[in-house]
Amino acid sequence: IIDPGGEANKIIESIAVEVVGIIITHHHFDHVGAIESIKNYYNAKVYDYGNLKEENNIGVFTFRVIPTPGHSDDSISVYFKDDNVMFVGDFVFNGSIGRTDLGGNEMDMKKSIETILSYDDSIRLYPGHYLSTTIGDERKNLEYFSKMF
């Protein structure tokens, strides 16, 4: 599970597999609200920027952690290469980027944008809110936002 923000009972009821881990892209309330309930229900370990390495295996999943501070100091993006998907929390949205005024930093955001732009355009991005997109679809937006800082 990635970023269980709330409604723990709905999350638990909708999952038909064993949960072995919970990944947090950043520690804002709307991404961590259901952690304790889900962690306790499944006896799952919680993973975040503090205890993940660059390359990770949790259960059957293999993924890369990419530090993407800017929206918050602890923001990470989680890239599943085999599936060509990246979970980006509130770092990037479809058509926009995350706010930097909630414990973030504009220069960190600029560096994080530059990091993500080094990845392949075909990677599907799943933000913490709203619709998914791809790096290619966001490239012009991200280049524009990067120049603002």
Which residues does each predicted region cover?
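Binuclear metal-dependent hydrolase catalytic cores
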Residues: 43-45, 50, 55-57, 134, ...
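Conserved beta-strand hairpin/beta-sheet module of binuclear metal-dependent hydrolase folds
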Residues: 1-17, 77-89
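Active-site metal-binding motif and surrounding structural segment of the metallo-beta-lactamase
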Residues: 6-49
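Residue-level signal for the nucleotide or nucleotide-sugar donor/cofactor binding architecture
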Residues: 33, 63, 103-104
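Core dinuclear metal-dependent hydrolase active-site scaffold
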Residues: 55-80, 86
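Metallo-beta-lactamase
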Residues: 73-149
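Short secondary-structure boundary/capping segments
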Residues: 13, 36, 54-57, 77, ...
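Active-site neighborhood of phospho(di)ester-bond hydrolases with catalytic His/Asp-centered motifs
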Residues: 2-4, 20-28, 47-49, 67-70, ...
